A protein has these predicted regions:
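Phosphate-binding beta-alpha-beta segment of Rossmann-like dinucleotide-binding domains, i.e.
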Residues: 80-139, 303-305
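N-terminal Rossmann-fold NAD(P) dinucleotide-binding loop
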Residues: 149-150
């Protein structure tokens, strides 16, 4: 039995997945094998030595100390695509709000309440002040064509928009899901120059911090309407407000409110609603639970943010899994120790991600703990697991 500690409210369907696999689940575990979280902040957490993995029911992992987890041999998983429909639907709503001043229009109508019978006439007289253009026939630029970006691009086509997409890391799976009518752009400046609307679906990293800034705003088609449902720090707020003031940016709709943006003209802030639907929470919880169970039971890695993805069907009597430095000679060392135990390797898999590698050996017999300790003593080996 594996012990799973929850650190946030997790959808019941996700907990049911774990319980069906005979896992003990509780928010009070003292020495868990895995953590299942949503937004719990772990940067100051002390991890117990038994902790093998962390499942994030969602996409963003800035609440998890990724480098420290890697150094301690802890796999970190997220759930890409599980909330994609939820975010896509909200973004389509935001697309219209970026065109028409719907928020301002509703507030204006509510302000007319004291006028009583005069309201219909006042509405007809003043409605042009909050009018805006159609999205049909306009061009939407999509930066990042993964699970969410590809769905947004395809949906925008159904609104009779023209769509350009930019993603230098486009995966084969995402490409298959993308309509052939989406124009693939390889120069980001072309996107800025030709699009009327812009939406981003990329991760927040040191490289993407202030991805949109004074320099990029200056390259945009005047009157650009920008949607940010990815991460707030992708946009330089000071430069954005200056671009709105000058008219270079017509409107900004974001799911990440802050003190600089709330209440500003032509800025619409949502209260981080992107993945806040019962369906998305259930999908994320179920997906994270399955990733955790597959890793704990089989050593398979799916959707890890710090280790290479590595999956191998169980083909031997026993399985050995190792997290180690990606350097020459490691596999030979492991194989020597396995052979010394008079055990044969039936199947193996070795995957790398930068400086980190992950290796699975399926063997004819179970190695003894002495062999595992020998491997743990090899410089550069972070974690050794013997699975039945």
């Amino acid at each position: 039995m594996f012990n799973i500690k929850t650190m946030n409210a997790i959808a019941e369907k996700g907990l049911d997945e774990l319980k069906a696999e005979k896992c003990a689940v509780s928010p009070e575990m003292s020495a868990p094998d895995a953590l299942l979280i949503r937004s719990a902040k772990l940067h100051d957490a002390v991890f117990n030595k038994e902790l093998l993995c962390i499942g994030r029911a969602g996409i963003g992992v800035d609440n998890i100390p990724i480098e420290r987890c890697t150094a301690e041999g802890i796999a970190v998983f997220n759930t890409p695509g599980a909330n994609a429909d939820s975010v896509k639907e909200l973004l389509l709503c935001a697309l219209t709000m970026a065109s028409r001043d719907i928020v301002g229009a509703v507030e204006w109508v509510e302000s007319l309440a004291p006028e009583g019978e005069k309201i219909p006439a006042l509405v007809e007289k003043g409605k042009n002040a909050v009018a805006g253009p159609e999205v049909s026939g306009k061009r939407l630029g999509v930066i990042g064509l993964g699970a969410i970006g590809s769905r947004v691009a395809n949906a925008a086509l159904k609104l009779d928009m023209e769509v350009s997409g930019y993603d230098p890391y486009l995966s084969v799976d995402s490409a298959w899901n993308l309509s052939s009518k989406v124009e693939h752009v390889t120069d980001l400046n072309v996107l800025f120059r030709t699009c009327d609307y812009l939406t981003m679906h990329i991760h927040s990293t040191p490289e993407t911090f202030h991805y949109l800034n004074a320099e990029t705003f200056a390259k945009m088609k005047p009157g650009m309407r920008i949607l940010n449902f990815a991460r707030g720090e992708l946009v330089d707020d000071d430069a954005l407000l200056a671009a709105i003031e000058s008219g270079q940016v017509a409107r900004y709709v974001t799911d990440f409110p802050n003190a600089k943006l709330v209440g500003k003209k032509n800025v619409v802030c949502f209260p981080h609603l992107g993945a806040t639907t019962p369906e998305a929470e259930e999908k994320c919880a179920v997906m994270a639970a399955r990733e955790i169970v597959d890793y704990l039971r089989n050593g398979n890695i799916r959707n890890s943010v710090n280790l290479p993805n590595a999956t191998l069907d169980r083909l031997g009597k026993s399985r050995l899994c190792l997290i180690h430095r990606n350097q020459p000679g490691m596999l030979n060392r492991f194989l020597e120790i396995i052979a010394a135990g008079n055990v044969n390797v039936e199947h193996m898999l070795n995957k790398a991600r930068g400086e980190i590698a992950y290796t699975i050996f399926d063997t004819t017999e179970r190695l003894d703990e002495t062999a595992a300790e020998e491997m743990r003593a090899i410089p550069g080996v972070t974690r050794v697991r013997l699975l039945g």
